[in-house]
Structures are given as C-alpha cells and as structure tokens.
Design a protein with these regions (language model features):
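A conserved mid-domain beta-alpha-beta active-site/ligand-binding segment of alpha/beta enzyme cores
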Residues: 159-182
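Short, charged/polar surface micro-motifs in flexible loops or helix N-caps
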Residues: 48-51, 59-62, 82-84
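Short acidic-glycine-tyrosine-enriched beta hairpin
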Residues: 89-124
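Short, conserved beta-strand element in jelly-roll/cupin
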Residues: 69-85
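A short, N-terminal "cap"/entry segment at the start of jelly-roll beta-barrel domains
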Residues: 1-52, 95
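Mixed-charge (acidic/basic) macromolecular-recognition segments
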Residues: 142-159, 164
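A short hydrophobic beta-strand segment most commonly corresponding to one strand
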Residues: 75, 121, 125-142
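Conserved short histidine dyad/triad with adjacent acidic residue
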Residues: 53-70, 105-106, 115-116
C-alpha cells in the first residue's frame, strides 16, 4: 500500500463510516494505556485487506508521547481536536530514528505513513478523535521492517467498558455525519 492507496482507503472508510458504526457488533475495542497518549480504539475491517480504527486520544505532554514505527502502512484523519506530531526516520532497521519534522495537525488533517522505517508520535493538545486505516502488517523478517515495530497483541490490554463504548460510538456517530474541515 503506497501513500495514494492509503489515502484512497481512508476516503472510502470515511464515506462508509455512518453505515459501519450502525453495526456495533462488528467492532472490537481496546484501551491502550501502557504508553501515552492513552488511546481508546474500536476497530473493524472495511474489506479483507483494510482495517478501520476509531481512536480517542487523551491529552499528554510532548515528552510523554511514545515515538514508534507502525507495523503496517496506514492513513489517518483528525475528526476533532489537534495534536503535535513528531516524525522520524531510521536509516536501517536497527537504528533509532533521526528527527525529520514536527507538525501541528488540526481537525480535518489527513496524512499517510507507508514507509516502514518512519516513526511518529502524537501529543494531543486537546482530546482528539481520529480515523485510521491500515493495510496488512509488514512481515517482521524482511530487510526493510524495523525490528522495534510492535503491535498491541499479547500485552494484556483490556476492552472498553459498555459505557465507554456507548460514549465512543456516540461521538463518532456525530462526527461521521459532517464534512472534514479540509475537504
């Protein structure tokens, strides 16, 4: 999946979002609270090769935000809120990243990260609601995948409570019905 394909998948997901949200039984939830920002995620599949995740990020300071590579190509849209995003890139699959850019991402921003040696962190300045799509995971044994890429599997993370899910879907139901600021 390249940048254009990732952004096209994101557009498809955003168009389908009101319909996807109506069937809450198809979504899995997770509270990612081992590193900041704390993330509340529900995810489902748009098709066999594209997962859609709806995130709520709690605020955190820039020095608390976890810099990480993703284990798959993806694209992101901010539906509400804003965050500071640091970007880095590793030269090899074993090196720590060098800083590339720091960006202020606002409501309506969209971007793709489809290069496996790219790292990023997000520092929400206010509570943020985002949509993420991702393609299949990069194989861990290929020469271009970073050795520190991680997933949430096997970390003992818990699902959202019923009340958290209701609140999460209510916000995304509201947000999915309005155009993005940068459309």
């Amino acid at each position: 999946m390249n940048d254009d394909q990732a952004l096209e998948a994101l557009d498809r997901a955003l168009k389908c979002l009101p319909e996807l949200i109506e069937d809450q039984s198809r979504w899995e939830s997770l509270v990612i609270d081992r590193k900041k920002p704390w993330t509340y995620r529900v995810s489902t599949f748009l098709d066999e090769s594209c997962r859609v995740s709806l995130h709520r990020f709690a605020t955190c300071d820039e020095d608390e935000a976890s810099l990480h590579p993703h284990p798959w190509p993806g694209a992101f849209a901010i539906l509400r809120g804003r965050y500071l995003m640091a970007l880095g890139r590793s030269e090899t699959r074993t090196e720590r990243p060098k800083s590339v850019a720091k960006l202020l991402m606002n409501e309506g921003s969209r971007y793709a990260i489809t290069e496996p040696l790219t790292w990023h962190s997000v520092s929400p300045l206010v509570e943020c609601y985002t949509v993420m799509v991702n393609g299949p995971r990069w194989p861990a044994d290929v020469a271009w995948a970073h050795i520190r890429m991680r997933t949430t599997e096997g970390k003992g993370l818990v699902a959202m409570t019923g009340q958290q899910l209701e609140e999460h879907f209510a916000v995304f139901r509201e947000l999915s019905g309005r155009p993005l600021a940068n459309n």
